[in-house]
Amino acid sequence: MPEELKTEIEARKAEDFKMTYLLDDALYIVHGFGMQETGGYSIQVQALYLAENAIYFETDLIGPVNGTKVEKCVSYPYIVVKTERLTENVVFE
């Protein structure tokens, strides 16, 4: 991941955020879910597809399973998907 993108994610990670980043021949699609009270979260990509007029990206934040021991530390879950550079807009669903 490019350093500039890492810096941008670090600056935004406390709040829910969605962004794209272009570098050379790559498109990075990013969704951050903000501050969570514990660890144990995962992110599932529900959809990533190119339609006629846009790239669609849908993700879900999945919390810790009930009864699972989780760390009591703050976490900032986010996902970065790298794909080929495209000119279409990204629609976050």
Question: Where are these predicted regions, by residue range?
Answer:
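Exposed, flexible binding/inhibitory loops of compact, secreted disulfide-stabilized domains
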Residues: 1-93
